[in-house]
Amino acid sequence: EEALLTALEKTAHQAQRAGQIIQRIRDFVKKSAPNRQLADVPTMVSEAVELAEIELRRHNVRLTHYVAARLPQVMADSILIEQVLINLMKNGAESIAQAQRPLSNRSVELRVVPRQVEGQDGVEFSVQDTGKGLPQEVQDRLFEAFFSTKTEGMGMGLTLCRSIVESHQGRMQAENLYNGPEVTGCRFSFWLPLAAPANDTADTVANAHPPRTNA
């Protein structure tokens, strides 16, 4: 009975979180502005993994994840970033299913590590799959609005993901993985800058609105 209650509570939490994600995406599409706050990276990853696992199990895909220890917080709309991660993990699972990989080679890996880009500290999120990879012509057009590798759907998923990342002053990219000439999968990654320290934020505000001086 206790196990059943725990399972029901988990299901209720997942349903509530899914509802929050849908509402935030609607708000973002209308305003194109994220609700950025100090966000804990491991918590975001945990929430995204919990929701994505449902879809990955449906495709018989194993999900593993690694989060580096003691990651600083990022300034982010956690619900939107969770949705980016969920989309990338689900896309990976669908690519694996399309490639008809054997059960021993059906995995998606999420890794979150610190990374510096052009001298700026940040956090890199990467989702790697063992799917069929992306043809070059698809890579070139991947983030165009309405372009899709799927036979159905509007193709807004990756375009929306990139818009969300870029609205956080981040960047997103995709690359195929190879074993010799053979494509063994694909890796999507995006980078977010760290939250500025409190003093830096105060300095920025002060510089944006300098005090008036009497002439």
What do the predicted segments below correspond to?
Residues 1-206, 211-215:
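Core catalytic ATP-binding domain of two-component histidine kinases
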